[in-house]
Amino acid sequence: MRYLALALVLAVAGAATLARAQDAIPDIKGTWSGKGKVLVFGNNVHNPGKQTMAEAPRMRDIEMTDVVEGQDGRLAWGRSSSRAADTKEPFAWAMSSVNKSIVGADTDGYFRITLLAPDRMEKCYVHSGMSPSKSMVATCYAMERVKK
């Protein structure tokens, strides 16, 4: 009977440890890089051209780098740049309590991010025609954490 009680105590302790490990907030600091397609009305520094909002949209390839400079619990911040423009545009992200979903903003648009693995995420980004660039974009693509 003593062994059964000991086994039960160990099982409960193990389950509690596993639950705490699953609840751990992921560390997302570092450099993330990805490529994808973006739908663009008009133009902006990351999607250059002479197109206007009145013209048909265009699809472009984009390559972005997000550097998550800091993280405090579920809040993270950093800077974004693209192959077309090294703007180092600031962003702010907030992670949900399930530790997989992130929402965020930069100076003219919004992020919706899903953490797929410790070093992989799907990043969706949009900004409206009311943004400072007077362009409109929508995109989703995978990003990988750059290993050093």
Briefly describe each language-model feature range.
Residues 1-4, 16:
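Positively charged n-region of N-terminal signal peptides that target proteins for export
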Residues 7-15:
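Bacterial N-terminal signal peptides
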Residues 17-21:
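Sec/Tat signal peptide C-region and signal peptidase I cleavage site
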Residues 23-77, 132-148:
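Short, solvent-exposed loop/hinge segments that bridge or flank secondary-structure elements
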Residues 33-41, 81, 107-108, 124-128:
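Generic short beta-strand segments
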Residues 63-117:
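Contiguous, well-ordered beta-strand patches that form the walls/edges
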Residues 121-136:
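Short, exposed beta-strand-loop hairpins at the edges of beta-sheets
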